[in-house]
C-alpha cells in the first residue's frame, strides 16, 4: 500500500522558510561596520570597557588589541570584527552612544546653570527661592549678596567677579547633588 501525497499538499519536512537574500556587498558593509564598532571599543579605557555587555572572548580580544602595534593590531581588529558577528551589536552601540553623549549632556547642564545664574541676577529673590527649593543646602544670603553685587558690577562696567562666583557656587551644588 503506497501513500501518495496530494499534489497541492506539502510534507511537513518540506515547509518553506522565508529566505531573506542579502547581497554580498551588503554583507561586507555590515562586517565593516562591526569592525569599526570594534575599533571604537579598542580605543576605550579598560574601566569604561568593563561596563559594556561583551562576551569573554570579545573582551579578551579587545584587551589584546589594545596592547598590539601596527600589523598585529590590524589583524586583531579583523578578528574582533569576526567575533562581533556572533554578538548583538545593539546593546554595545547603545552603551557607546551613551558615553559619547555624556559630554554633550554635561555641556547642556552647564548651559542650564548659566541661564539660572542670569535669571538670578535679573529677577532676584523669586529665582533664588527656586534654587533654594532645588538645593536646600545653598546659602540664600550669599546668593542675594552676589546677585546685588553682580548687578552693580554690570552697571559700572567692572570685571564680573560676582557673576562668576554665582556660577561656581551653582556648579558645585549641581555636582554635589549627584553624590
UniProtKB/Swiss-Prot annotation:
The record's Gene Ontology cellular component field reads: cytosol
List the Pfam families.
DarP
Q: Does the keyword rRNA-binding apply?
A: yes
Q: Which domain of life is it from?
A: Bacteria
> Where does the protein principally reside?
cytoplasm
Q: Which UniProt keywords apply?
A: Cytoplasm, Ribosome biogenesis, RNA-binding, rRNA-binding
Cellular compartments annotated: Cytoplasm
One Gene Ontology term from the biological process aspect of the record = assembly of large subunit precursor of preribosome
Q: Which GO terms describe its molecular function?
A: ribosome binding; rRNA binding
Q: Which InterPro entries match?
A: DarP, DarP_sf
- Give the family this protein belongs to, as stated in its UniProt record: Belongs to the DarP family.
* Its job: Member of a network of 50S ribosomal subunit biogenesis factors which assembles along the 30S-50S interface, preventing incorrect 23S rRNA structures from forming. Promotes peptidyl transferase center (PTC) maturation.
PANTHER family for this protein: UPF0307 PROTEIN YJGA
Q: What is this protein called?
A: Dual-action ribosomal maturation protein DarP
Q: What is the protein's species of origin?
A: Aliivibrio fischeri (strain ATCC 700601 / ES114)
